[in-house]
Design a protein with these regions (language model features):
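Secretory targeting and sorting signals
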Residues: 1-27
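Acidic, metal/ion-coordinating pockets
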Residues: 2, 22-383
């Protein structure tokens, strides 16, 4: 596998149901470098990015970049590789499932080439959330192919499952001196019913279940609990009522005075949305689309905002005393866009010298990201 792996990943099974958390045996599975987890607590950086949504034009671009030998998504992501690969832990959102044997498609029923998992891993990503409204575009077979390909690439995943045991597991990753649990949920599956006999195939938004899962992950040894949520109103810059209400409820949940959830990462709206500190916990309502083809908004008009996004970067410091939470000591956002002409993700901080147009995109993203007062809580634009 190409790319720098930055941590040992641990899978902890049988622990998502809070009532059963103490009864199940913890199972450790290593991936990546095979190095043992660090024993001393030390600070770490976490980077997160938005929806990977390969439309037909994106698939065609990856085919072109492979020079006739399959599909290569690495050049597409090369512009953000420096930021992603330097993080101790990097998480993406894989919105689509994978096809096979050339059966690939874009909107409205997505089936992406499995080589995208290799491209994400090569860029430095350690895992992806997979619960989305397109998670059942090809039924249970699509989920199986997707997670199989991620496993082969060394890319961890959370939010969908091939088996009931997998659905009951917690995705646990090592970052610095911390064990980080990654949970993932979606608002729905575009009215596609869950596979017969597999109600656990996709994790769906349910406040009580999400809190129970977070508590179970903590009981299993998670120092930091990160929750990815596929939610929001498409093409709306502002978070909607569900986002605001759920963010309040999730961040207010505590056990023995310690918050159950340490970071919330939002996707789905297609446009960047605000960052906000809610009850002392950072919430990104919407990261935007990291990779997408031409996007048409709810009025049927091509909308360039659908190719804008941010990378969120958070520095976590060890607790000041046993039993306390890991604290975010630095919160940053990095503006980026998917350039339709070149088929490349561009870090706008690095590309800003290319002209006023890109500067305008960066400024538009900044205005939305800071629209709920995040600057007052210390959020800054990162390099």
């Amino acid at each position: 596998m190409i790319g720098r792996r930055k941590q040992v990943a641990l899978a902890l099974t049988g622990l998502l149901a809070a009532a059963a958390a103490c009864q199940n045996q913890v199972r450790h599975e290593s991936a990546g470098t095979g190095r043992p987890a660090p024993s001393a607590a030390r600070a770490f950086t976490l980077v997160a990015s938005g929806d990977v949504l390969p439309h037909s034009s994106v698939i065609e671009r990856a085919g072109y970049d492979a020079d006739g030998n399959g599909y290569d998504f690495r050049p597409m992501l090369f512009g953000v590789e420096p930021v992603v690969s330097r993080a101790d832990l990097a998480l993406c959102h894989m919105e689509t499932v994978y096809g096979a044997d050339g059966d690939y498609s874009g909107y409205p029923v997505f089936k992406s080439p499995p080589q995208i998992a290799q491209g994400l891993a090569a860029t430095g990503y350690d895992g992806c959330s997979t619960a989305s409204d397109h998670a059942l575009d090809d039924g249970a077979a699509g989920i199986r192919r997707t997670l199989d390909a991620m496993d082969r690439a060394g890319l961890r995943h959370a939010g969908t499952a091939r088996t009931q045991d997998e659905a009951r597991s917690v995705t646990m990753l090592q970052a610095g001196g911390a064990r980080v649990a990654h949970l993932s949920y979606a608002f729905g599956t575009n009215d596609i019913p869950l596979p017969t006999g597999q109600p656990w195939a996709v994790d769906l938004i349910d406040r009580d279940r999400m809190i129970a899962d977070a508590r179970a992950a903590r009981q299993a040894g998670a120092d930091v609990v990160v929750v990815s949520v596929h939610w929001g109103t498409e093409w709306q810059d502002a978070p909607d009522r569900l986002q605001l209400t759920l963010a309040q409820q999730l961040t207010a949940s505590k056990t023995n005075g310690r918050p159950d959830i340490d970071l919330i990462l939002g996707t789905h709206a297609h446009v960047p949305q605000a960052y906000e500190k809610v009850n002392g916990t950072w919430v990104i309502y919407g990261l935007g689309d990291q990779i997408a083809g031409e996007m048409y908004n709810d009025k049927g008009v091509q909308d360039s905002r659908g190719n804008d996004s941010t990378l969120g970067r958070f520095t976590f410091a060890p607790p000041v005393r046993p039993g306390a939470r890991w604290q975010v000591t630095k919160a940053e956002y990095i503006p980026q866009m998917y350039d339709l002409d070149s088929g490349r993700v561009r870090d706008l901080n690095q590309a800003i010298s290319d002209g006023a147009e890109l500067e305008g995109v960066r400024d538009r993203i900044r205005e939305v990201v800071l629209s709920r007062g995040a600057a007052d809580d210390g959020l800054v634009m990162g390099e």
